[in-house]
From Swiss-Prot:
GO terms for molecular function: DNA-binding transcription factor activity; DNA-binding transcription factor activity, RNA polymerase II-specific; DNA-binding transcription repressor activity, RNA polymerase II-specific; protein dimerization activity; RNA polymerase II cis-regulatory region sequence-specific DNA binding; RNA polymerase II transcription regulatory region sequence-specific DNA binding; sequence-specific double-stranded DNA binding. Keywords: DNA-binding, Nucleus, Repressor, Transcription, Transcription regulation. This is Musculin. Residues 93-102 have a biased composition (Low complexity). Residues 107-159 form the bHLH domain. It is found in: Nucleus. Transcription repressor capable of inhibiting the transactivation capability of TCF3/E47. May play a role in regulating antigen-dependent B-cell differentiation. Pfam families: HLH (PF00010). CDD domains: bHLH_TS_musculin (cd19703). Expressed in lymphoid tissues, B-cell lines and activated B-cells. Residues 46-56 have a biased composition (Acidic residues). Residues 1-115 are annotated as: Disordered.
């Protein structure tokens, strides 16, 4: 029983509970070993982790400020957002890599360059054959393509003039200054016209 003395710690604690204010730590009775183990903060934290439902109930009964704190303390679900993100991203088609597009453009450019080089080689060979067919041109003379075409045009005009002047004279066309493809050697004009353009341009006639 209480003796009524102010220094009695149990009575002070009882009065503090009745007046709803905490008892000073200096006047609290000493806790026993078992009570200390229950009151340790580590046990409280472990109890809170093991009993999340109880914590949610306390948060529901608390004030708005404490509810906000409880919302912040709720653990986030790991992997939920990642699974949703992966599910949403799975429907999108992967974009083509920049390296493959650059390689495709480079291959197309290389193919176009190869075709252009082949065309220029064929054209150069054709001009070389035309230059060797022209008379009065030394073999070591370097002519441009334009000069070669001009000489060929003048040479063709000269041959046509010779054919018109010497036609059917002595029964044949004199072959002097005549080279391929104008070796007709006595053929009539009708036979000359029937010679195809391919034979005149691509082969020698005897």
């Amino acid at each position: 029983m209480s003796t009524g003395s102010v220094s009695d710690p149990e009575e002070m604690e009882l009065r503090g509970l009745q007046r709803e204010y905490p008892v000073p730590a200096s006047k609290r009775p000493p806790l026993r070993g078992v009570e200390r183990s229950y009151a340790s903060p580590s046990d409280n934290s472990s109890a809170e982790e093991e009993d999340p439902d109880g914590e949610e109930e306390r948060c529901a009964l608390g004030t708005a400020g404490s509810a906000e704190g409880c919302k912040r303390k709720r653990p986030r679900v790991a992997g939920g957002g990642g699974a949703g993100g992966s599910a949403g991203g799975g429907g999108k088609k992967p974009l083509p890599a920049k390296g493959s597009a650059a390689e495709c453009k480079q291959s197309q450019r290389n193919a176009a360059n190869a075709r252009e080089r082949a065309r220029m080689r064929v054209l150069s060979k054709a001009f070389s054959r035309l230059k060797t067919s022209l008379p009065w041109v030394p073999p070591d003379t370097k002519l441009s393509k334009l000069d070669t075409l001009r000489l060929a045009s003048s040479y063709i005009a000269h041959l046509r003039q010779l054919l018109q002047e010497d036609r059917y004279e002595n029964g044949y066309v004199h072959p002097v200054n005549l080279t391929w493809p104008f070796v007709v050697s006595g053929r009539p004009d009708s036979d000359t016209k029937e010679v195809s353009a391919a034979n005149r341009l691509c082969g020698t006639t005897a």
